[in-house]
Structure formats: C-alpha cells, structure tokens
Regions:
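Charge-dense, helix-prone N-terminal extensions
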Residues: 1-156
C-alpha cells in the first residue's frame, strides 16, 4: 500500500473531504471542515532529504517519519500499539490516534478495514447538525459549504 492508493480509497468513502494542512499533510475529514466535520486520517507527504554522506555525521534514528495517522478509537488503541510499526500519533494520542512508521504494517485489505473503521468512528461522533447536513442532497451540501467558507473568510 502507498499514499496514492490510500488516498483513492479514502476519497471513495462517504462524505470525505481532503485538505492540505500543516505543511505537507493531507488531512481527510468526515464532512467538510467548514460545516463542522472532523478529521479521521492524515497522510504525511513530506519527503525527508537523503542522509548526508559526511563521515563525521551520525544517521538520525530518533526522528522516524510517520507516514499515516488515523483514529483508532479507545477500544482498539492499546492492541494496535502492540503491533510493530505503529506508535501513538504525535499530538493526537490523547484522542486515541495511532501512526504508522511503514506502509507494510498492514496488508492492503487490513489498511482498508482500519481506515473504514476510523471513518465510522468519526462519523458516529459528529454532532447531529453536521450529520443532518451530510444527509442533504449533494448540491445542498455544497451550497452550505460555500456559504460557511464565505463566513469564515469574512471573519479573518
């Protein structure tokens, strides 16, 4: 599995919006952020520079790049952290997010199951007003999103 395949899968889930945030992070939301959606997965697209070949420089091992973070939920969080290659997600561990250090932590089918579960967990936590908005026809949803973004732009 890789970032492009996971991106295609995530965008195929219901009510998913993507947004670039915090540098080179592709963040996936259940419902658009403008209408109160919540994020459920994040792919780090940052490509670190190749290590220096200087003889006196030690390779950096403590700053392992995390490829993908997602909402695991309280029920699965501890069990997932026992799996090699999964760690608590920085800044998000307190809300039961895990992060993958490698793409081969799961098979393609397992990745899909994990991210589908993250989507479902997050969808269930959305406020009633946001869920009601997501139940509207797509054209109405888009109109509400555009209006919400206009209001946010006026405030800033």
């Amino acid at each position: 599995m890789d970032a492009e395949r996971l991106r295609a899968y995530l965008l195929g889930l219901p009510h998913v919006a993507e947004m670039m945030q915090w540098g080179a992070n592709l963040v996936f939301w259940v419902g658009d952020k403008a209408i109160g959606g919540k994020m459920f997965a994040l792919i780090d697209l940052y490509e670190p520079a190749p290590p220096s070949r200087a003889a006196n420089q030690q390779p950096a091992t403590s700053n392992q790049q995390l490829l993908l973070s997602y909402s695991a939920g309280p029920a699965r969080y501890a069990a997932l952290l026992e799996r090699d290659g999964l760690v608590p997600a920085p800044y998000m561990a307190r809300i039961f997010w895990v992060a993958a250090e490698r793409w081969d932590v799961f098979s393609a089918a397992e990745w899909k199951r994990e991210l589908h579960a993250a989507h479902e967990i997050t969808l269930a936590k959305l406020p009633k007003k946001v869920r009601a908005t997501l139940a509207l026809p797509v054209a109405q949803q888009r109109h509400l999103i555009v209006e919400a973004r206009r209001k946010l732009a006026k405030k800033s």
